[in-house]
Amino acid sequence: MDPAWKTGDVQTQTWEGRAGPADYRLEVPALGSFPPFERFWREQARRLIRGLRSMGGPWPVELHASFQETRRDDAALSGFWDISRRTGHAGWDLSRVTATFLPGSGSPQPLPVLFYPGRQRRLPPLVQREVLGLRQRGECLLFRDCGARCLRELDPWRYYLTGEGLAVFYPQEVLGPRSAGLPTVLIPFDRMEGQLRFPF
């Protein structure tokens, strides 16, 4: 394990208040375990608050962000922020921010870094298979062309790691209607054997 990383459950703090027309409540990691990881999320929170202060308009805004650490071990430190935002009496807009730190890295790493050169091209078909499986099993209401959409919209920053595999997600209304939320698929590590540079 990176000597700067400490094991154990992540501790969070709640930042709440008002900025511009918005009431916000944000969960951020507390300082003390791995400063670059914590600084990243705190800067995301400050940026979000600055954006709220610059907003105009007559409607009140509510914004909540909940933090989830998904992996912390010898191989990676990974987590995400789920953000819910509502303007006036409209429905909630959902978004997600993720970050994965690898040993020796002081900043979040994009998806291609996980793979040996040239091996990442094997990932899109695995993601597509899982997305189509979601639709066929009825686990998530997705558009008929979700298989093509998931390939076009695969993004190097929309992922996080768990103990079981690589989770890839898509923004609201990209693969399905608003009610589908943030479609997420998990690719087990054993399906990527020989492709990954790190011993996940």
Locate the predicted segments by residue.
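Compositionally biased intrinsically disordered regions enriched in Thr/Gly
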Residues: 1-200
